Regions:
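Glycine-centered flexibility sites
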Residues: 92, 100, 124-126, 132-133, ...
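Hydrophobic alpha-helical scaffolding
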Residues: 53-57, 145-148, 206-208
Length: 210
């Protein structure tokens, strides 16, 4: 834990800084095996970078590219479903939340070690920005809403880490990617959405999309 703490202490989000500040240079004794800590660091940094990124640049396409970059050559199967598929499969909730945004929704599925005896599923909330929709949040309530996709980022970080460590478990990750925005096409309080399981849901507050 001490070694991991040292490694994580070097994190800085400087994507928008014109001149990088001096980086911390931490040297480790070569006899210390820090591979596991490095895997953990990579996963944590992935989440931090995405959470810190402004919503202007955190588009669904950008998020998907970062997931592809993260898993790289790992034995993880990534499937990207687009809006056309979501409509065909009756994902009324995902479509409803996203329909006020100019950015189309996606649904990502990750699969690792599906033949393992012990299987786990993670579902991560991927609202890339949550204005509240027509049930608009207050200005102060929106200040941190670029972080409303932290659940999705964490789910992908976990499956990457599990694969890197070669754990003998099966893991599936499900993450919708949407923006909840107000516009003339947004869902309204009183609208009824039909979910994939056939149930209907009346929307009383468009900010209850989670």
């Amino acid at each position: 834990e001490f070694t991991l703490g040292l490694i994580l202490s070097g994190y800085k989000f400087q994507k928008y800084v014109e001149k990088d500040s001096e980086e911390k240079n931490i040297q480790f004794d070569k006899t210390i095996d820090i591979d596991e800590q490095q895997f953990i660091r990579d996963s944590i940094y992935f989440v931090r970078d995405l959470v810190n990124l402004p919503a202007l640049d955190k588009t669904p396409d950008y998020f998907i590219d970062k997931v592809k970059e993260l898993i790289g050559s790992e034995k993880i199967k990534l499937t990207v479903f687009d809006k056309k598929w979501l409509l065909k499969e009756n994902f009324g909730g995902v479509i409803g939340v996203s329909q006020g945004s100019a950015k189309e929704p996606y649904f990502l599925v990750g699969e690792y070690n599906t033949s393992a005896d012990f299987q786990i599923a993670l579902i991560g909330k991927g609202v890339l920005f949550d204005s509240g929709g027509l049930s608009l949040k207050s200005p102060s309530g929106m200040e941190t809403m670029k972080t409303d996709m932290a659940g999705a980022a964490t789910a992908w970080a976990v499956i990457k880490l599990v694969s890197s460590l070669g754990l003998n478990v099966g893991l599936k990750v499900y993450t919708p990617l949407v923006e909840n925005m107000p516009s003339s096409t947004a869902i309204r309080p009183g609208d009824v959405l039909k979910m994939r399981n056939g149930k209907t849901v009346e929307v009383l507050n468009t900010d209850a999309e989670g």
